[in-house]
Regions:
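Bacterial Sec-dependent N-terminal signal peptides
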Residues: 1-13
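N-terminal beta-rich core of secreted/periplasmic extracellular enzymes
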Residues: 10-138
Length: 138
């Protein structure tokens, strides 16, 4: 009866991987069984934040862009590409995202993906980080 009512109401049952009451093993197995190979490989991709990418794209010379891997410039890649990959679930994390607005924007993109896997947002900071206004580093 419940299944019929759910079908009539147009509601879908929550996938196991989104059910917090299911065990971690059940959730992981369910999610992996739903993922395509492209999505699994995509979940190993980490990019720099879009604003970091834009800033380096305009502040570096052509030679620096071609030879400097420390600033994480991706030759031939556009912001549109990065947004599209995120919408398709082909990015798992971003580094150098400095504002909550950008972090929220990126998370909204990831929630448009088929499986809605949230992103990890990080910063590459060995000795602490004070990139956000008002932070204290100990």
């Amino acid at each position: 009866m419940t299944i019929t009512l759910n079908a009539m109401a147009g509601t879908k049952e929550q996938p196991i991987y989104k059910n917090p009451k299911a065990s971690i093993e059940q959730r992981v197995n369910d999610l992996l069984s739903r993922m395509t190979l492209e999505e699994k490989v995509g979940q190993m991709n980490q990019l720099v934040g879009i604003e970091h990418f834009k800033q380096n794209s305009v502040s570096m010379t052509a030679e620096e862009l071609a030879t400097n891997t420390a600033s994480a410039f991706y030759p031939g890649v556009t912001v549109k590409d990065m947004e599209d990959w995120t919408r398709r679930g082909l990015v798992s994390s971003f580094l150098h995202v400095l504002t909550m607005e950008e972090a929220n924007y990126l998370q909204k993109l990831s929630m448009q993906s088929r499986l809605q896997i949230p992103l990890l947002i990080g910063i590459d900071a060995i000795h602490g980080n004070a990139k956000c206004k008002g932070n204290t580093v100990y």
